[in-house]
Amino acid sequence: RHPLRMLFHGLGTQAGLGGGSSDAASTLLALNKLWRTRLSRQELTAIGLQLGADVPFFLLGDNAWVEGIGEQLTAIDYPPTPFMLLKPPVGLSTIQIFKDPNLKRDTKPATIAGFAEIENEHKHLFGRNDLQPVAETHCPDIRHCVDLLKGYQPSARMTGSGSTVFAPWFLNHDLQAIPSNWYHLRCMSLKNHPLKHWAD
């Protein structure tokens, strides 16, 4: 069989939201079901890791604490939370960010134990993004996005290698006074991947 796959979504490239990795994971799950190969989630994960470091996370199907290069996953309970996404009209290359000599690689690692100690309603305050300072030098608009969102939510920060910025959004109104060419979206996080049940 030769599946024809057409995909439409609103995520731009180089957004730092794992769009490509999510697509890869969904494709693996769909082919596993279509071709009735009955590969286990563990087997799919081994394949997914060869496609990209973030693919195993999307194959897991749960919110997770991720370590290593993306293959060490611990499922966590994280309640559905409203978020605001804000992205300038430019993207960033992940390779470019990781090759930057100014990227700090010796910061103290965050731990799942520290995350577990925080009450659910404050978990969004945990953590940091070590890629953000470097990304901001390559794309100053990221800093502008962070500053704008921090006016509403102090925990605003960049996601992935950029260039999207996110913050929990418990307000009833939309963002105000943003440039017309910036992408923004109010969304709700999911407790599970919609296709999680397609793998054992």
Regions found by a protein language model. Name each.
Residues 15-43:
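DPxDG-like acidic metal-binding loop motif
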Residues 40-50, 146-147, 176-178:
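Short, well-structured alpha-helical segments that form the helix of a local strand-helix-strand
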Residues 2-18, 155-156:
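Short pre-catalytic strand/loop immediately N-terminal to key active-site residues, enriched for Gly-Thr
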Residues 164-168:
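Short beta-strand->loop micro-motif that forms the acidic, two-metal-ion catalytic signature
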Residues 7, 158-161, 186:
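A structural preference for short, hydrophobic beta-strand core positions in alpha/beta folds
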Residues 58-60, 65-155, 170-200:
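Conserved, helical-rich catalytic subdomain that frames metal- and/or nucleotide-binding sites
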